[in-house]
Amino acid sequence: VIKLKKPLVSIVVLNWNGKEYIKKCLESIKKNTKRRLYETIVIDNGSKDGSVEMLKKMKGRGFLDKLILNRENLGFSNGNNQGFKEARGQFFFMLNNDTLVTKNWLDNLLKKAEKYPKAAAIGAKIIDKPMFDSKNYKILSDRERMTVCGGAMLMRRNAAEKIGMLDAEHFSPIYGEETDWCYRARNAGFKIMETDASIIIHFGSHDTTKQTGRKKQFILMNTNRLKAMLYNLTIPEFLGHVPGLGLVFWTALKQGEAGWLLKAYWNNFRSWREIFKERKKRNAGLF
């Protein structure tokens, strides 16, 4: 076995009051990943639930390589960007703290990275815990996407160096940042891929749903995802998303959340000057 001087992959895990989840997450990484391939970087965003003390102990036991401690919650983009700056790998892997990785997850992702050299990011298959059946799970295919989930996303360092890190200025504290990054990568000539060959088990949006409330989460998520589209997509690309946006509105209407969705739309409408300015800056163009 040839030991690499630098890890091939830097796994970046952001934590905020997720003590009950991140311990299992880190244990699954150590159990299911070849040690010579990776380093693990954990950023704690000002947790008050005992996470910090536990993470310090786990670092001493070899479950993580670097621990970054923030005094307050700096948000998803800022937190992950801190991890990227400390990372030594050729690839970054953003991983939610409320997840478990499975056998051969990283090996399979790296095979896909080799297969798709033009891919700036490759999203793993995220399956909710109650729905996962390892015996009957079938690998279907790889797909090119407009965007993939930042909760389990492999990113090439050279792509990140070309287009920049996550946009903390426009997408704080959370939501839309990985969508925006994927759009920027595509506009720079890269591809975004998703594969079923790497499986990540997800317990649910612990940090946001439990601690910020459903209404605030819903408005913020839809505000920022629409903002990412308006910042980066051409008119034909945006029109291609209109049916999906209509379905989102119909679902919100049935669930009594249409008012929240209209609030998200209004947040972007009243910021139209900033949106046009940002489109010009990003050279999004019209067609």
Model feature map: region roles:
Residues Y38-G46, K66-N70:
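Short beta-strand/loop segment that forms part of the nucleotide-sugar
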